Amino acid sequence: RHHARTHPAFYVTYSKNTVLRDIMLYHCTGMAVIAQFDENLTMERFDIRIHPVKKRVFTVTADGFHCIYCKGQILIKDCFLENQLDDPVNIHGIYGRIHKVLSDSEVLVELVEGMQKGVPLGKSGETFGVINNETMLDVSAEVLAEHKMLNRDYQYMRFAKPVKGLQEGFVVENKDYAPDVLVEGCTFQNNRARGLLLTSAGEVIVRDNTFRSAGAAILIEGDSNYWFESGATKSILLEKNRFIDCAYVPDWGEAPIQVSPSAKKYEDGVRYHKYLEIRDNDFYCFDDRLVSAQNIEEICMYGNRIHKTDSFEPIPGEKMKLEGVLRVTDKPHR
């Protein structure tokens, strides 16, 4: 990292119906937008661009739009993001790790990842998933009866009824925050790392965008052992996008589209992510790689076009690298 992420341009928290429109941002020493526990958030014609006169080679020193535990709809429309020092968009929740089981309805929960310290995971009345950290599949869904922040590392949770099979090491996730996402008409280019990081259980649509990403243009992940970023997806549609010479830095992506949750232990007939549809996109590729995916139930691909380029030396790899994928079809659910 270039230096400490000291000052985001916008910090939006516990808000509703926030619109950031017609904004030109040249630089900030942090993320452009941090949004947390918000309902209905719009970034429209919000550009992050290199200054036309100054000689600075990067724009913001971290992510563009970083949304944590939001709900309702996140709309990102007609935006232009370039030259950030991290991903343009990251949408996710937070897994809290069960540090200690106090009773069959009480747990001490730890925030493990350093940048999540001090974040309250929810409040009484909200629904939490109790999740097996090895499979990352839900064990149960429970209503939170009581919540207390003990310090920046630990918080106390009491559920409304006893929970069978509570174990230390399992994780919890607030299920009330799972936004629908629409990303449309945007350009994402020339930044460090990846493109869109999408982990939300809402309806996710990515349509008519242009990607020039050093790593994966689309990364669908989720993990319970490092970043602790949550969000098993149910339905993601990638439609009419242009993926131009993406994934030329292997450390940041195995293919232009990558699905790679951290769980490597599977249960029969069930996967962490559910459905990904890739249709009518244009892939401009300097090698064969299109999709690298694991731990997802179904991928549907049809109507896509592949255009060969010679922009970079080819990187060895399969067109479709799959592990633990239950079905690949050309027949959409919609």
Regions from the PLM with identified roles:
Residues 4-15, 30-38, 65-68, 174-175, ...:
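Extracellular beta-strand-rich solenoid/capping regions of secreted or surface-exposed proteins
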Residues 97-129:
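Surface beta-strand/loop "capping" patches
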